[in-house]
């Protein structure tokens, strides 16, 4: 039985959609589109308007939706929880996070990704991600305007990072960096496991952007190495995003990392 899946990748200034036709025999890309948008102050170029254009360009009848939103909207924390049951973890995460965040737990949507595979024994290491409900609502409202109810909701760059980790040699470490015009997100891959996610603001295009990006990455890695017992020695840096269009980003990343 065939299935249509529409993947919608929402970034801060663009939305990209890929329509996948899936069956037992094959997975085939049927269509794709990449659209810019701006803020709500310009209704004709808003996210809702871009999504409406998407529905006009693609036949979405019967599609299931998988959606990602910008990773910089979330706050990430590495935690260790003294049990492995996922239901119990979900129950205690709001209380574990509330002491480290300037928000009330009831104002957040929280999820997690385990770092040590399937939890076993009495310890689970994880990355918790929390997003304010007030920041999530505009995305959900825009999706609702085209009757899109996501089957899965994730964060930009995370599926790619997990795919890279899944394909990696267990003995080889990597850095994956997503760069757009105003934010960067760093994914630390130790062997074939994701171990850290951090997002940070970047200045607009100009001579200070590349040095600040490199400084943020170096500071993040220094803090990670200080707090972790892992022996992290990346052999490869993979970068992606519209921010790479600036001519000095790649050379400076190469020199710094």
Regions found by a protein language model. Name each.
Residues 1-2, 48-59, 164-172, 224-225:
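Phosphate-interacting basic helix/loop segments used at nucleotide- and nucleic-acid interfaces
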Residues 51-64, 146, 220-236:
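Phosphate/pyrophosphate-binding loops at sites that engage ATP/ADP/AMP, CoA/4′-phosphopantetheine
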Residues 17, 67, 96-97, 143, ...:
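Buried hydrophobic packing residues in well-ordered domains
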Residues 232-256:
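Glycine-rich phosphate-binding loops at beta-strand->alpha-helix junctions
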Residues 1-35, 65-70, 164-196:
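Gly/Thr-rich phosphate-binding beta-strand-loop-beta motif of the actin/hexokinase/Hsp70
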Residues 64, 68-167:
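Active-site neighborhood for divalent-cation/phosphate handling
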Residues 136-160, 193-231:
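Glycine-rich phosphate-binding loop plus the immediately following alpha-helix
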């Amino acid at each position: 039985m065939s299935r249509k899946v529409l993947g919608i990748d929402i970034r801060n200034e663009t939305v990209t959609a890929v329509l996948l036709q899936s069956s037992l025999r094959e997975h085939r890309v049927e269509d794709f589109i990449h659209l810019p948008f701006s803020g709500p102050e310009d209704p004709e170029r808003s996210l809702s308007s871009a999504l409406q254009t998407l529905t006009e360009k693609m036949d979405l009848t019967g599609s299931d939706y998988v959606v990602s939103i910008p990773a910089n909207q979330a706050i990430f924390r590495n935690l260790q929880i003294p049990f492995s049951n996922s239901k119990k973890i979900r129950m205690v995460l709001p209380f574990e996070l509330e002491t480290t965040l300037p928000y009330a737990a009831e104002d957040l949507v929280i999820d997690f990704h385990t770092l040590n595979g399937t939890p076993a024994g009495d310890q689970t290491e994880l990355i918790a991600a929390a997003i304010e409900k007030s920041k999530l609502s505009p995305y959900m409202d825009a999706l609702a305007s085209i009757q899109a109810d996501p089957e899965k909701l994730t964060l930009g760059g995370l599926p790619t990072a997990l795919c890279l980790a899944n394909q990696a040699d267990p003995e080889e470490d990597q850095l994956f960096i997503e760069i757009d015009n105003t934010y960067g997100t760093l994914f630390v891959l130790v062997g074939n496991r994701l171990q850290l996610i951090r997002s940070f603001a970047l200045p607009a295009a100009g001579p200070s952007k590349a040095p600040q990006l490199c400084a943020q990455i170096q500071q993040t890695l220094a803090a990670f190495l200080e707090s972790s017992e892992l022996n992290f020695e990346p052999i490869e840096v993979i970068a992606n995003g519209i921010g790479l269009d600036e001519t000095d980003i790649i050379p400076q990343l190469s020199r710094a990392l």
